[in-house]
């Protein structure tokens, strides 16, 4: 009986020693025993191919770009968000300016040190951010997920899905993408019968000039809205500009006016400028007063609101096809 008691005591001591060693190792790795038992929360790669391994659902997310700001606000409650970019407060650029008021911290300074000061457990950014900045944040121990800026409407959906997964909001992401697919299907149902060569040619303007490069996101927005992007037709690309004479030669059906300006320029003044410019006197868009404004909050969007832009574009140019539609947003 005594021998057996010694064995039990020694066995118990050994178990305690192993448990203590396990906890010590877990702490050394920056985790807890519960985390190790539960396994990984997320293992995968971001859109740039960098491996990301996470052990728990994030509670303090920082977003550094407007596109990721808008997706994050649509998927996560404010208490899960530590900070957003300063752009999200600009109602001239952001579809989510009102929702963003629930998140008090907005970052204009996106230096690694400023981001670190927010104590984030996840940082969302995009491929437009310099690689050196991303590397510096990772060197400080921050977990950075880089999301690729979409060049097509189809690319918006995996972007929402991947962000939803990395922040622990997969169900919300699935629900959002479901609504967006329905929105696109509705536009297609209303416009699919319009022959390609009869679809209106639209030319969009920023205050600085013609907007809408070939094979960029706005170009695809137009395609999904059953419109032809005149700037792309004339050859506008990242490396190639087009002249106003080329715009005139297209004889566009519609001019889309800008709504946002960092210098305070006004849409109505721009409208009058086009109307009174002798160069555009005989262009169909001016002759028939098809000078429309689709807010730049949609035209520049690289989030779920890019899909909403398709709806707004189609409804603006084809109002008679949406006469029964109240226009509730699918993206917010």
Identify the residue ranges that each predicted region occupies.
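A short, structured surface patch at a secondary-structure boundary
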Residues: 60-118, 122-127, 227-230
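Structured C-terminal subdomain patch of bacterial secreted/periplasmic proteins
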Residues: 158-165, 172-174, 178, 185, ...
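Proline-aspartate-enriched helix->loop->beta-strand connector
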Residues: 105, 111-128, 142, 243-260
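His/Asp/Glu-enriched short active-site or ligand-binding loop at hydrolase and phosphoryl-transfer sites
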Residues: 217-239
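Short beta->alpha connector loops at strand-helix junctions that form conserved
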Residues: 126-127, 146-150, 233, 295
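Extracytoplasmic ligand-binding site segments that recognize negatively charged/polar headgroups
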Residues: 90, 132, 148-162, 197-220
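Bacterial Sec-exported substrate-binding components of ABC uptake systems
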Residues: 2-6, 12-13, 25-69, 171-202, ...
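Short helix-initiation/N-cap motifs at beta->coil->alpha
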Residues: 47-49, 102-113, 150, 235-244
């Amino acid at each position: 009986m005594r021998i057996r008691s010694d064995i039990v005591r020694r066995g118990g001591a050994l178990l305690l020693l192993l448990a203590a060693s396990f906890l010590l190792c877990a702490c050394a790795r920056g985790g807890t025993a519960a985390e190790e038992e539960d396994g990984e929360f997320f293992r995968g790669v971001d859109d740039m191919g960098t491996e990301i391994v996470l052990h728990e659902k994030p509670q303090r997310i920082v977003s550094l770009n407007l596109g990721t700001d808008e997706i994050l606000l649509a998927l996560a409650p404010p208490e899960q968000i530590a900070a957003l970019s300063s752009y999200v407060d600009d109602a001239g650029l952001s579809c989510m300016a009102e929702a963003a008021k629930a998140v008090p911290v907005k970052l204009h300074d996106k230096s690694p040190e400023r981001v670190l000061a927010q104590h984030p457990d996840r940082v969302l950014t995009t491929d437009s951010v310099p690689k050196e900045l991303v590397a510096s944040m990772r060197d400080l121990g921050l977990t950075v997920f880089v999301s690729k800026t979409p060049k097509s409407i189809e690319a918006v959906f995996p972007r929402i899905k991947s962000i939803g997964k990395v922040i622990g909001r997969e169900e919300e992401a699935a629900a959002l993408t479901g609504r967006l697919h329905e929105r696109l299907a509705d536009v297609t149902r209303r416009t699919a019968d319009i022959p390609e060569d009869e679809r209106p040619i639209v030319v969009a303007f920023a205050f600085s000039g013609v907007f809408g490069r070939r094979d960029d996101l706005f170009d695809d927005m137009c395609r999904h809205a059953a419109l032809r992007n005149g700037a792309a037709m004339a050859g506008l690309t990242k490396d190639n500009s087009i002249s106003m004479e080329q715009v005139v030669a297209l004889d566009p059906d519609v001019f889309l006016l800008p709504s946002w300006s960092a210098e305070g320029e006004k849409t109505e003044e721009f409208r009058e400028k086009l109307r009174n410019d002798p160069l555009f006197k005989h262009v169909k868009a001016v002759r028939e007063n098809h000078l429309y404004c689709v807010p730049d909050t949609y035209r520049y969007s690289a989030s779920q609101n890019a899909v909403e832009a398709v709806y707004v574009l189609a409804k603006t140019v084809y109002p008679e096809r949406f006469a029964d539609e109240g226009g509730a947003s699918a993206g917010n």
